[in-house]
Amino acid sequence: MKQLKITKFPALDYAGNEAFNTLSTNLSFAGASVKKIMVTSCHAAEGKSYLSMNLMRTLAQRGIKVALVDADLRRSMVNSDYGLKYEDGRNDGKGLSHFLAGMVGMDEVIYQTDIPNAIMVPVGRDVPNPLALLTNSHFAELLDMLARMADYVIVDAPPVGVVIDAAEIAKACDGTLIAVNYNDVSRQELLDVKQQIEQTGCPILGTVLNQVDYDNYMGRKYYK
């Protein structure tokens, strides 16, 4: 298996560690049939990739085998934000888009990361109109293969409220986590996203709040 190094991965603080440990534990309550998990959001820049990457790391550190698929084929930021380095030292390499386009085989896009227990399928290159690639049978076949290799498959998808790609991705997944910026998304927007995902037959596992002032939030909760 090819090797992939993640060179920019800041450590979580205490509150962050506790939050991701809790989320990892809660995933186990979803049942053994829930293995392929899509992570999405209502808008761009709500932290879905942050959620995906840190959930991958937390699960792996707990000895759970996990695969991450970067499926944001339009404008992924994982390569640059997390400093992915491929075997030859390059900043880019073969990934999901290359496999779905039939340019390489499945084994060419599955990488062992430098985090034990964590494998990854990077995005490859941006695609202007990826819907045709996501609707072919190769995408579901890749997720099924990864589900045999790992305990969980985390799929970092585009925002539901921006493009239709995530709804197509959801059809191949067992459940969805929605990243939500605290006080930045309206109730109606969240309900619309919930409806779009549920129409695909993929259940909502829950929402994860980002950008929360933890001390202030817990203080208000305690004194109410």
Feature-to-residue mapping (PLM):
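Short phosphate-binding/catalytic loops that engage adenosine nucleotides
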Residues: I64, D151, C202
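Hydrophobic positions on the alpha1 helix immediately C-terminal to the Walker A/P-loop
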Residues: Y50-L51, L55
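Inter-motif core of Ras-like GTPase G domains
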Residues: M145-D151, V160-N183
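Conserved beta-strand segments of the P-loop GTPase G domain that flank and frequently precede/overlap
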Residues: M38-T40, V69, P122-V123, V155-D156, ...
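Short, glycine/acidic-enriched loop or turn micro-motifs at the edges of active sites
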Residues: L73-R75, P159, D213
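C-terminal lobe/tail of nucleotide-utilizing enzymes
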Residues: M1-S33, Q188-K224
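Aromatic pocket-lining residues of Rossmann-like dinucleotide-binding sites
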Residues: L59
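P-loop/Walker-type NTP enzyme "switch/lid" segment
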Residues: K2-N17, N21, T25-S28, A32, ...
